[in-house]
Amino acid sequence: MKKDIHPDYHPVVFKDSATGKQFLTRSTATSDRTVEWEDGNEYPLIVVDITSESHPFWTGAQRVMDTAGRVEKFQRRYGGMARRKKKTQ
């Protein structure tokens, strides 16, 4: 590998905002927030919406995630289209 062309790859803690579960892994992601891990070291903390702990594919539970009203916005824009098409047919 060439030197000094690859991003910094370091330990990072990812936290699932839905379940609170935390994972220590390696990533190029950075954060100003830190958390003390079980080994006593501090690592950057990245908070994410979905992980394998909360994703419907892995949990088997279906749920609708509404991030900043996106579902309602979609329903307002396109929700009536299905009803309108049925009336014209």
Swiss-Prot record:
Gene Ontology CC terms, in alphabetical order: ribonucleoprotein complex; ribosome
A Pfam family assignment: Ribosomal_L31
SS bonds (residue pairs): none
Record-level GO BP terms: translation
Gene Ontology terms for molecular function: structural constituent of ribosome
Matches recorded under SUPFAM superfamilies: L28p-like
This protein's UniProt keywords: Ribonucleoprotein, Ribosomal protein
Assembly, per entry: Part of the 50S ribosomal subunit.
Entry similarity comment: Belongs to the bacterial ribosomal protein bL31 family. Type B subfamily.
Xref: NCBIfam families: L31, PRK00528.1, PRK01678.1
Protein name: Large ribosomal subunit protein bL31B
Organism: Corynebacterium urealyticum (strain ATCC 43042 / DSM 7109)
